[in-house]
Amino acid sequence: TALNASYVARDELIASALAQEGMEYIRSVRDNNYLNNRSSWLTGLSTLGCYNNAASYCIVDPTLGDVNTTPSAISASALASVPVLKVTSTGLYNHRTIATNTNTRFKRTVQLTTVNGNEVKVMVVVSWISAHQSYSVTVTDNLQNWL
């Protein structure tokens, strides 16, 4: 129906924004490594369980701002257990368990794969279920070493 189509379109817009936010978060980690003269452009990323591991995914929560512990690895077999994003009353999406947050239907995962010594492929997937149907939006980008 037209109503269902409008809900799907709304969810696709939200998912696209969440996927892009995840990509921008990973990009900001790379940028901050450069700006802070860290020894590796992948500091905070290369030690994650989802780095060069096709059987593992990470979740990111840019609102926490902790690049070393925020992304946590989730095995492919446990992908169904990825926590849903929550939303605040002001529309901010996060993973915080706070009484005022409301669960959403959206889940966001990240994978990082080495292309070569100076390039990493980042894939962010936002998935959700609506009316018993699975949907997803995928954003990929290759990040370069600026160091």
Which residues are covered by each model-predicted region?
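Low-complexity, Gly/Pro-rich coil/beta segments used as flexible assembly/activation regions
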Residues: 17, 23-147
